[in-house]
């Protein structure tokens, strides 16, 4: 069960990281 929680946590961090990178790129264009 713990392995699933860790995997979910890592996936969430990855999604948040890539999302923030996209936001920063959009800001640079403006």
Curated annotation (Swiss-Prot):
Per UniProt, the keywords (alphabetical) are: Secreted, Signal
Annotated tissue distribution: Expressed in venom sac and, to a lesser extent, in venom gland. Not expressed in brain.
Coiled coil ranges (UniProt) are none
Q: Where in the cell is it found?
A: Secreted
Principal location? secreted
Q: Which domain of life is it from?
A: Eukaryota
GO annotation, cellular component aspect? extracellular region
Which protein is depicted? Ampulexin 3
User: What is the species of this protein?
Assistant: Ampulex compressa (Emerald cockroach wasp)
The beginning of the lineage is: Eukaryota, Metazoa, Ecdysozoa, Arthropoda, Hexapoda
